[in-house]
């Protein structure tokens, strides 16, 4: 089984056909999208709606070719929650780049896509930002490090069942991202992961922009599509492949 990990898209529709071609070129069986599908520096309400309509069509086409697992990032959660709920109100206040005028349509489209908080193949854990030991002990139980990775994944995904539960990882923000709490798998910064990442697991994450796919602290960092506010790229657009032979970086343009 060949699994391709794709970093934060941030409403860049031009990336989608390039990712499809890379997946085809690499004979990909499964694709994991590492979250932050939504929002970008200068995207408008209408621009985000148009992007998400394009993304939805692209997702359906890709899901017809291979298994596709879309994960939620911190930028996606406000659109995932229903407008008018107390959970939505709490999350919206913490959402950088949120486009309220796009919420209704994007929320509607998201209901037809099976988003998750975490994914595992039984050996590795993929989340948007990474699982730290402190957050795991606090939110999953003091004995969570004794759990199989599938159970850790299941407990994280159960947070999607109730809006109030999803608020928990969305409001657990560490100092590196402007909070004062224990960083969650939606918010953990690369520096925070270096200090307390759960390294008894092999993790794959996005969230922190990197110049190229990086391996450090037994984790793979894959946010290579993000840009500066003027649109200049931070990363090289590389992707991560997991094959029977292990992990390796894949160029976006082959």
Feature locations, PLM:
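Core catalytic region of metal-dependent phosphoesterases/phosphodiesterases
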Residues: 6, 11-100
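A structural motif corresponding to the C-terminal end of an alpha-helix
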Residues: 58-68, 101-122, 201
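Beta-strand-turn-beta hairpins that frame and shape the catalytic cleft
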Residues: 1-4, 119-125, 216-218
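Active-site-proximal loop/helix segment associated with metal-binding centers of metalloenzymes
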Residues: 93-101, 115-195
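Acidic, low-complexity terminal tails and accessory targeting/binding regions
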Residues: 253-254
């Amino acid at each position: 089984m060949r699994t391709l990990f794709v970093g934060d898209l941030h409403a860049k529709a031009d990336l989608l056909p390039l990712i499809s071609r890379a997946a085809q070129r690499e004979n990909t069986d499964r694709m994991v999208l590492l979250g932050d599908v939504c929002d970008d520096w200068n995207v408008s309400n209408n621009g985000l709606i148009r992007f998400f309509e394009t993304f939805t069509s692209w997702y359906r086409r890709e899901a017809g070719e291979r298994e596709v697992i879309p994960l939620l990032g911190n930028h996606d959660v406000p659109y995932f929650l229903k407008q008018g709920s107390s959970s939505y109100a709490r999350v919206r206040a913490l959402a950088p780049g949120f486009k309220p005028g796009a919420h209704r349509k994007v929320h509607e489209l998201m209901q037809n896509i099976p988003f998750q908080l975490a994914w595992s193949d039984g050996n590795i854990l993929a989340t948007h930002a990474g699982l730290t030991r402190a957050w795991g002990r606090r939110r999953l139980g003091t004995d969570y490090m004794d759990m199989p990775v599938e159970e850790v994944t299941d407990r994280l995904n159960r947070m999607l069942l109730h809006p109030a539960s999803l608020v928990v990882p969305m409001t657990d923000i560490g100092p590196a991202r402007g909070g004062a709490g224990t960083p969650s798998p939606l918010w953990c910064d690369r520096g925070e992961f270096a200090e307390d990442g759960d390294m008894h697991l092999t993790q794959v994450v996005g969230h922190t922009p990197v110049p190229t796919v990086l391996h450090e602290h037994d984790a793979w960092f894959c946010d290579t599509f993000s840009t500066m506010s003027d649109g200049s790229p931070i990363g090289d657009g590389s992707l991560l492949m997991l094959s029977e032979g292990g992990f390796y970086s894949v160029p976006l343009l082959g």
